[in-house]
């Protein structure tokens, strides 16, 4: 098989690493694999197509900020990509994030409909079936069900400073993204699959393939983290996000800090320099790290991982914590609860701070050691990247066979 993946980035960020992990599995099985990507430098992949350049990205950003016309820039770069696709002639075209200031979705989907090749589209958020935003559930917006308009998230990614074009964007996306003859949608969670089936994409078959992680990297890992941060006698509550925002639950950590016991400490990884300066007593802020090995050390050291997300498609950070033997407490939001069972953590109703405090007390009373083996087993049974991304290979084969 010859597979072409298309994503905004390659080898960086969660979706970029998913693409390169899948690329590696395809190569290990003797298949041909190429990744086309739109921004930054490619990592962990030697067979790539760069879509445009930063000089294509910048006008697309401007178009988005001024006209709220995200996904309708980068025309020249997209035409060149289509020429490369024709020359490559892949058996399956696998789409990931098409947002990110690098593609003209109109040109791409006109080509996909004309080419009539099998297409797999992994949705990593909700941008595909809205008129603007990538996430809407955390504010309770329901406009996407019928037609977006008067977008309450116009100032969120992909940010528009002036115009609200959400109604027109919705109409154009619906026209472009429907009617593709051989398209299969994949979502990382049952939650997102449910939304897809209620959207204008409902005509397509939807498969759920959970994200996977590298269990050789994310595993219980000893370190001197406690000593370096003077936390030897502290119960460590860990949070990881990049960037920290309202949706990621940043405010809940600030509120939680006011209710800590004297021997409890919050560690937040991924805080900005500005956020770090404003953190209250009780919270240690650490900048974003691109080192998975360093993250594994921090996950392993923590007594409890807290994910008070208001909306998450699945929650890669949950999986990483579990794989390192650390129990997880998360809100009942999005696909985040799908990561857990009762043996490796607790689920609290979204926004319930007293419930969060009670869950922390419950885990602390039982002790991390009572959870660790089951946390690791949960990750091994359900979120091993080789097994999960191997499901994509089987999906490709089934699609081509049919």
State the predicted function of each range.
Residues 194-197, 213-228, 277-278:
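Acidic anion/phosphate-binding donor-loop and adjacent secondary structure
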Residues 231-248, 254-257:
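Conserved donor-binding/catalytic core segment of Leloir-type glycosyltransferases
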Residues 273-296:
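Nucleotide-activated donor-binding/catalytic signature segment of Leloir-type glycosyltransferases, i.e.
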Residues 277, 332-342, 346-347:
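Short acidic/histidine- and often glycine-rich active-site loop of Leloir-type glycosyltransferases
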Residues 288, 342, 346-353, 362-367:
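Conserved acidic donor-binding segment of nucleotide-sugar-dependent glycosyltransferases
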Residues 297-302:
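Short alpha-helical donor nucleotide-sugar binding micro-motif in glycosyltransferases
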Residues 310:
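Aromatic "clamp/platform" in nucleotide-sugar-dependent glycosyltransferases that forms part
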Residues 327-330:
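Short hydrophobic beta-strand element within catalytic cores of glycosyltransferases
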